[in-house]
C-alpha cells in the first residue's frame, strides 16, 4: 500500500553531519539536476544532469557514485510544494526518490528541503545571464539543484550547524 502521508521538509538540527561536501538534487520526471557544495558549506555549484531511469536505475547508481567519489556527508533533495504548503504527485515522487536513494547510500543522510520557486528562480537567473530558453533545457535542472542546496547551506548557517566543533 503506498505511503499517503504528505512529505514535509527537513530542517538542519543536532543530527547535522558537520563539515563536508553536500549534494543537492532536483528530481524531475525526465531529468535530475545535481549540485555540490565546497567542504565548508559556503557555496553550491552545478555538477551534472542525470536522466531519470526507472528501468535500469542508472540514475540512482550515478548519484551513489558521486556520493562516494566526492566523499559526500549529506544529500539534500528538493521537495516541490505549492503556495498553500500542500504537496502533490511531484512531492510524493521526490520523497519516494529520496527514500530509495537514502537506502542505497546509507549511512549518508538524505534530507528533503522545500524547493518552492527554485526552478523559476533558476530560469530568471539564467535569462538574466543571457542564456536563451532553448539553451536552458540542459542546465536548468542543475541551476535548480544549486538553488536547493544553497538554501540548505544558508539554513545551516542560520541554525548554527556549520559543524565547526572539534
From Swiss-Prot:
GO terms for biological process: rRNA 5'-end processing. Its EC number is 3.1.-.-. GO terms for cellular component: cytosol. InterPro entries: RNaseH-like_sf, YqgF, YqgF/RNaseH-like_dom, YqgF/RNaseH-like_dom_sf. Residues 1-24 are annotated as: Disordered. One of its GO terms (molecular function) is nuclease activity. Pfam families: RuvX (PF03652). Could be a nuclease involved in processing of the 5'-end of pre-16S rRNA. HAMAP family: Nuclease_YqgF. Belongs to the YqgF nuclease family. This is Putative pre-16S rRNA nuclease. It comes from Mycobacteroides abscessus (strain ATCC 19977 / DSM 44196 / CCUG 20993 / CIP 104536 / JCM 13569 / NCTC 13031 / TMC 1543 / L948).
